[in-house]
């Protein structure tokens, strides 16, 4: 799931823990709530026929509410960093099956990938790695009815502004010709090979094959173009690696590399990275990249499982992967999967 949106979910969830629980959703009948959304959608130009095709017969989904309330990160087993083991996470997520599937998918889309890389500057293996992590290369896209899920989450009320916007954007998708029957995905409203949200689909999905539809469900071309467009929009730097593994000796000079900047987004993710230095400056401190990278590249040191374990010099492109899902575990697994499938 793209996560600029996940970031918003996390922020709203955290806020909800600090304030009183709002009035029950049942205080406002579901049908009345849908009518209020329909009025807003009409004011934004959505035709009544699209609204009727989506809202007719819609009911709340109790399973979605249960999943939303259970959506709490597990603490996991700690390491010297106080965080769950990155090595353990990678063993569970970058499996032989996922790697082999990525190799096959990359071969299948090789010509598309070359075209996409020329147009957007994003390597095909990065796009395929996202595809693999999000939906197992299209095999698991979710079976929840998207309008029902989004309407339920918006009606429930804790994050109404967030989910109501996505619900209205689903109506816009249908108004623009997306078949109602295609609107299935995750319980939180993400869909398609890349697990876009409706707002992301409307803004960044691409009709890569020129057939008149932005089909991120069935078209490899549209999927590749759309994920690449997301990355370009988020600031991907052409020709720069996402990270390089680095040798960090025990004697490395660690003085003055702490990151004292409090990130306004995902602070617990970014606080684990050092401050930014050039690769040349890292070399002067004894940190040696294991792969080619320009000396003037800005990079942050990240030792996910602590000193004496693998270290990485992260570039700006790592931050772009975080835009898709703001988790060090996710971003590392995507980057390393991309490296594996492109060997």
PLM features: residue spans?
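C-terminal soluble interaction/assembly domains
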Residues: 249-343
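Sec/Tat signal peptide C-region and signal peptidase I cleavage site
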Residues: 21-25
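Bacterial N-terminal signal peptides that target proteins for export
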Residues: 2-11
């Amino acid at each position: 799931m793209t996560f600029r949106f996940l970031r918003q979910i996390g922020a709203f969830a955290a806020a909800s823990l600090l304030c009183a629980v709002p009035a029950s959703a049942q205080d406002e009948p579901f049908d009345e709530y849908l009518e209020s959304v329909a009025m807003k959608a009409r004011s934004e130009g959505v035709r009544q026929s699209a609204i009727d095709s989506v809202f007719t017969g819609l009911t709340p989904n109790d399973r979605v509410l249960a999943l939303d309330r259970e959506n709490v990160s597990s603490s996991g087993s700690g390491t010297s960093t106080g965080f769950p083991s990155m090595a353990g996470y990678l063993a569970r997520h970058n499996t032989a099956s996922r790697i082999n599937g990525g190799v096959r998918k990359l071969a299948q889309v090789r010509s598309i990938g070359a075209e996409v890389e020329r147009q957007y500057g994003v390597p095909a293996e990065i796009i395929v790695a996202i595809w693999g992590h999000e939906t197992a290369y299209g095999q698991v896209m979710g079976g929840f009815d998207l309008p029902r899920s989004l309407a339920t989450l918006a009606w429930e009320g804790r994050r109404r502004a967030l989910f109501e916007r996505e619900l209205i954007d689903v109506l816009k998708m249908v108004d623009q010709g997306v078949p109602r029957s295609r609107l299935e995905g995750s319980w939180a409203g993400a869909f398609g090979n890349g697990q876009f949200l409706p707002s992301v689909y409307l803004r960044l999905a691409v009709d890569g094959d020129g057939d008149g539809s932005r089909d991120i469900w069935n078209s490899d071309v549209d999927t590749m173009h759309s994920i690449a467009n997301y990355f370009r929009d988020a600031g991907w730097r052409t020709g720069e690696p996402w990270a390089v593994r680095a040798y960090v000796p025990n004697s490395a000079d660690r003085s003055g590399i702490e990151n004292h900047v409090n990130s306004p987004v995902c602070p617990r993710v970014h606080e684990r990275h050092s401050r930014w230095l050039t690769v040349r400056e890292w070399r002067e401190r004894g940190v040696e990249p294991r792969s080619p990278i320009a000396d003037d590249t800005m990079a942050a040191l990240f030792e996910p499982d602590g000193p004496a374990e693998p270290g990485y010099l992260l570039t700006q492109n790592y931050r772009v992967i975080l835009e898709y899902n703001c988790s060090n575990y996710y971003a590392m697994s995507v980057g390393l999967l991309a490296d594996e499938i492109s060997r």
